[in-house]
């Protein structure tokens, strides 16, 4: 190209035609019959200037219900949290601005160190020994955990609580179908996994049991009781967890979890329709050589200086091919970096305070709903989400709330017929007392 930023100039076209030995564009396409060639002009709008284009796109974007102008009480896996300003600044640096894993670690020390710090912080939050460099999202991390369990135990049955995120369960079903595994759902009772049903289903054919903590309804599962049931038959205990909640809750590792997975979206990753997110995957040392995805390790170079490498690669698909522990050969490097920067900026006390505010504000919202005459469906402890009985279709309620610049909660009837007309309300640290009061009052007026 003669001009780096002006591709396909007349000079470029002439040079390319000469190189391939033809004189004109028509000669280049001479093999295409004249009868089927397009003639005339394409029916597209005239080109716009940069300022005109920005104005038009801004007008289109303004039609969306964005979280700068709307108070959001919608969670169900994607949450409106505070992201420190420094996050965007750091991840926009050219050295970091890639979603991919470095293949030349010796010249990517900064990137590898950032991933190493992500792994370290995930281990500290979950109480586990080792974490990978991240997964695509929480759903794929959950499915990969089940595949690891099935491969390790050589058993074909997977038990998953119905209180696990419905979309994560759908991803699990997709993975399991290809591996000819049986997925059995354990019903929930009073908002948490039914332990009696779980006890009756766990036998020596079960590879693993998967629960969520806090679960999809916001309730805190009794991990200590579940762990005893699971390990009686030497099945693996897998816990999907909101990492922010672990700033306040006892980490799953303390309850004997074998694998802890989840989505790091609460840390520095904005809400968005469809992703990308950042799954995390942490486990005990026993499964270190079976963990999926990239692992960054710390070492020293020939001069004795600290360095970072992609380690234990012999288990990965690009080396072991069909015998690899997983098909994933990548990670979410940029979003993992965002999560690392957010956690670092907040610090340990900041993460704890952020989690505490989620709990206190959600508790305040629950009390306000009850004072207004609403029924909060489940009575157990919860983190930042709870279920409200709307007594009418949730869609009607949300449509009315949207007119008041409020994004209402998740319609549980979409996934659970028994919870029709029930709304899953999420309250994060960003919601103010005024916003919570307005939500409750507006829903009370609709009731």
Swiss-Prot record:
GO terms for molecular function: glycine dehydrogenase (decarboxylating) activity. SUPFAM superfamilies: PLP-dependent transferases. The keyword Oxidoreductase applies. The keyword Kinase does not apply. One of its GO terms (biological process) is nucleoside metabolic process. Its EC number is 1.4.4.2. It catalyses: N(6)-[(R)-lipoyl]-L-lysyl-[glycine-cleavage complex H protein] + glycine + H(+) = N(6)-[(R)-S(8)-aminomethyldihydrolipoyl]-L-lysyl-[glycine-cleavage complex H protein] + CO2. It comes from the Bacteria. Keywords: Oxidoreductase. The glycine cleavage system catalyzes the degradation of glycine. The P protein binds the alpha-amino group of glycine through its pyridoxal phosphate cofactor; CO(2) is released and the remaining methylamine moiety is then transferred to the lipoamide cofactor of the H protein. The glycine cleavage system is composed of four proteins: P, T, L and H. In this organism, the P 'protein' is a heterodimer of two subunits. Belongs to the GcvP family. N-terminal subunit subfamily. This is Probable glycine dehydrogenase (decarboxylating) subunit 1. It comes from Bacillus cereus (strain ATCC 10987 / NRS 248).
């Amino acid at each position: 190209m003669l001009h780096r930023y002006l591709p396909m100039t007349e000079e470029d076209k002439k040079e390319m035609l000469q190189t391939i030995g033809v004189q004109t564009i028509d000669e280049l396409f001479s093999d295409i019959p004249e009868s089927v060639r397009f003639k005339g002009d394409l029916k597209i709008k005239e080109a716009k200037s940069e300022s005109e284009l920005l104005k038009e796109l801004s007008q289109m974007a303004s039609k969306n219900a964005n979280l700068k102008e709307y108070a959001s009480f919608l969670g169900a896996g994607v949450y409106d949290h505070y992201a420190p300003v420094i996050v965007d600044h750091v991840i926009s640096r050219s050295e970091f601005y890639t979603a991919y894993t470095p293949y030349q670690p010796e010249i990517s020390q900064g990137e590898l160190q950032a991933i190493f710090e992500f792994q370290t912080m995930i281990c500290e939050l979950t109480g586990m020994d080792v974490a990978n460099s991240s997964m695509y999202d929480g759903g794929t991390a959950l499915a990969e955990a089940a595949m690891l369990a099935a491969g390790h135990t050589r058993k074909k049955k997977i038990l998953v609580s119905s209180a696990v995120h419905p979309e994560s369960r759908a991803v699990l079903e997709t993975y399991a179908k290809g591996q000819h595994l049986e997925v059995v759902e354990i019903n929930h009772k009073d908002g948490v996994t039914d332990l009696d049903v779980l006890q009756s289903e766990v036998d020596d054919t079960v590879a693993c049991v998967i629960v969520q903590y806090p679960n999809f309804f916001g309730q805190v599962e009794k991990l200590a009781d579940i762990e005893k049931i699971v390990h009686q038959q030497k099945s693996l205990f897998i816990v999907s967890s909101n990492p922010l909640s672990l700033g306040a809750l006892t980490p799953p590792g303390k309850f004997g979890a074998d694998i802890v997975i989840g989505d790091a979206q609460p840390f520095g990753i904005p809400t968005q329709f469809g992703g990308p997110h950042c799954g995390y995957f942490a486990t005990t040392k026993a499964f270190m050589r079976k963990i999926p995805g990239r692992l960054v390790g710390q070492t020293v170079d020939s001069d004795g200086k600290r360095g970072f490498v992609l380690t234990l690669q012999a288990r990965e698909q690009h080396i072991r091919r069909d015998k690899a522990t997983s098909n994933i050969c990548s990670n979410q490097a940029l979003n993992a970096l965002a999560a690392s920067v957010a956690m670092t900026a907040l610090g340990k006390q900041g993460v704890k305070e952020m989690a505490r505010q989620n709990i206190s504000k959600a508790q305040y919202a629950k009390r306000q709903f009850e004072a207004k005459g609403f029924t909060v469906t489940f009575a157990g402890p919860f983190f930042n989400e709870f279920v409200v009985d709307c007594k009418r279709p949730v869609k009607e309620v949300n449509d009315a709330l949207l007119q008041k610049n409020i994004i209402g909660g998740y319609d549980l009837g979409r996934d659970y017929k028994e919870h029709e007309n029930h709304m899953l309300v999420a309250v994060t640290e960003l919601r103010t007392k005024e916003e919570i009061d307005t939500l409750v009052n507006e829903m009370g007026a609709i009731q």
